[in-house]
A protein has these predicted regions:
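Juxtamembrane regions of bacterial inner-membrane/periplasmic proteins
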Residues: 2-251
Length: 251
């Protein structure tokens, strides 16, 4: 007599685990493909641009409090290659945001340790995000401080550090970073604030734009506060520390 075999469905926990593993695998494959594609192709939008559009439809934009709900939100975003951005602009943002940019693999652990120590004893928190982290966050993610978002930011940071050159990371950063209400990238910022292309930015103008980057929701390039002017002066006085425009040529 032929024995009968009864095949039972695997336990629910196993099916859930298998489904999650499959989803994670698909996510990793798709994000690697996206990163490899964006190594050569300019992004048509970014996570932050999409987030700001959604906020504009709910009246929750972090900029003007005088806007009405479902405002006419018109993002200004114009991609230009790094060769059409004044080299001093790259020097200014590296001086301001991430002086170890050329040497780290996405994370400045010394700056992170200092920020943790500072935040334990001060009311206002200090960040330690590198240019690579900011690029990953602005391109692929959204604003927020949850552990899930921070974990995704770390993943995408490692991904672009692996797939892109430092030059490409800086190029994407300068093109998608937020400089003000609906103003994305240094070309749009140069045209909006100085009525000139990014290729013609002066040292003072580049330093001013870099000075608002810690928080473009609060600091303005068209009406700089005393803090922004002080920050601009500090950037101008410290750009030589990383080697000036020669720094960009070595990336």
């Amino acid at each position: 007599m032929t024995p009968r075999y009864i095949f039972r469905d695997p336990p629910l926990s196993y099916r859930i685990f298998r489904g999650l593993a499959y989803a994670v695998g698909v996510f990793i494959i798709l994000t690697i493909i996206a990163a490899l594609l964006l190594r050569f192709v300019p992004p048509i939008t970014s996570g932050v641009m999409i987030e700001r559009y959604i906020e504009s439809q709910t009246g929750d934009l972090p900029f003007s409090k005088n806007r009405s709900k479902k405002q006419n939100y018109e993002p200004h975003y114009h991609w230009v290659p790094l060769s059409k951005i004044a080299p001093i602009m790259g020097v200014a943002v590296v001086t301001s945001e991430d002086q170890e940019f050329a040497d780290h693999f996405g994370f400045d652990w010394e700056a992170i340790d200092k920020a943790i120590e500072y935040n334990q004893t001060h009311r206002h928190t200090r960040g330690a995000s590198t240019i690579s982290q900011q690029t990953a966050k602005n391109l692929f993610l959204w604003d927020g401080r949850s552990w899930i978002r921070k974990g995704l930011e770390a993943y995408f940071t490692v991904l672009i550090e692996t797939c892109w050159s430092k030059e490409r990371i800086l190029e994407v950063y300068l093109n998608i970073i937020e400089f003000g209400d609906g103003i994305y990238g240094v070309e749009s910022a140069a045209q909006h604030f100085f009525n000139k292309p990014a290729a013609q930015l002066s040292n003072d103008e580049a330093a001013l734009l870099a000075a608002v980057l810690p928080n473009p929701h609060v600091y303005r390039a068209d009406n700089p506060s005393a803090y922004v002017i002080e920050r601009q002066t500090w950037i101008l006085n410290n750009m030589h520390r990383i080697g000036g425009t020669e720094y960009i040529k070595k990336l």
